[in-house]
Amino acid sequence: MASFFARTRRFSLVSLFLLELFTINLIPTTDAQIGICYGMMGNNLPPANEVIALYKANNIKRMRLYDPNQPALNALRDSGIELILGIPNSDLQTLATNQDSARQWVQRNVLNFYPSVKIKYIAVGNEVSPVGGSSWLAQYVLPATQNVYQAIRAQGLHDQIKVTTAIDMTLIGNSFPPSKGSFRSDVRSYLDPFIGYLVYAGAPLLVNVYPYFSHIGNPRDISLPYALFTSPGVMVQDGPNGYQNLFDAMLDSVHAALDNTGIGWVNVVVSESGWPSDGGSATSYDNARIYLDNLIRHVGKGTPRRPWATEAYLFAMFDENQKSPELEKHFGVFYPNKQKKYPFGFGGERRDGEIVEGDFNGTVSLKSDM
């Protein structure tokens, strides 16, 4: 494993282009690429077995679990739901410095459940940044990931279960135009070796993408319709690619940043995206409904740079009354009483700028420590 980065070839721009063309034929273009993040920071939420029954009742086929919550893992047995299984940031140091701890973690939380629980990815940490409040943890992300990967590989499961991490958009230094996307220079020493690992392991990078926060951070230059997928036409022309919504522009800036490292081709999974219905600037029921509905129906189309279906996870399953600040309490797609907050669904048609309501059909992720 120590030689994985040395074995990663630097791709020319032509090689990257040809590899993306080849990959288009490998990635399924289905409309069932949506997940929903389910958090547990509330004192009025249903137990895990009822929540998973709610997924099944709504034909929800994917989930993100941010830590190995044992009641949830047990309830997931034979459910057919694909899972992103998370490792909390608090466990990174132990797993990075002790291979036996990584093997024990895999035995306890993966082998004890797989394959009756359909674990698809293991997310080693969430939003760790070498320049943020979690900077002291950055040194542990890659070695923890390598140790978990080695434990998975020893069981012959490295092709079935991909080991990765989740980042946020603060690691992007330039995002405009999207084709010029690049990572911040002060995070390259952290990210480049990790990207090399992803190329070696054939694993995707998980990225949390929130047009909401980009809009409220710069409402003068980023309009609300652009953030909500409701712009009447192309807002950003970037060479041959036209951008009518902010989500595509943000995601393609990540694609470009990865490509522009020259390390190799990496797929991206959107591990969080959402819009709060209350508690802050530009928050309303209608804004949240429109964003979520449009995102659900949009991801099957992909982005201008990568025009195949995007795997994405909405945030969040429930409104969580123990989160802060106030807007963080209002990202839910369902109320804590298990009633739908929004009537959106797949396959709807927009009429005169309105969202046509449809049956909910998506994917859920469990979030218990964020």
Curated annotation (Swiss-Prot):
Induction: By fungal elicitors. This is Glucan endo-1,3-beta-glucosidase. The lineage of its organism: Eukaryota, Viridiplantae, Streptophyta, Embryophyta, Tracheophyta. Implicated in the defense of plants against pathogens. Keywords: Glycoprotein, Glycosidase, Hydrolase, Plant defense, Pyrrolidone carboxylic acid, Signal. It comes from Pisum sativum. GO terms for biological process: carbohydrate metabolic process; defense response. InterPro entries: Glyco_hydro_17 (IPR000490), Glyco_hydro_17_plant (IPR044965), Glycoside_hydrolase_SF (IPR017853). It is an enzyme of class 3 (hydrolase). The keyword Signal applies. Glycans are attached at residue 361. The active site is at residues 127, 272. Its EC number is 3.2.1.39. The modification Pyrrolidone carboxylic acid is found at residue 33. Belongs to the glycosyl hydrolase 17 family. Residues 1-32 form the signal peptide. Constitutively expressed in seedling roots. It catalyses: Hydrolysis of (1->3)-beta-D-glucosidic linkages in (1->3)-beta-D-glucans. Residues 348-370 form a propeptide. GO terms for molecular function: glucan endo-1,3-beta-D-glucosidase activity.
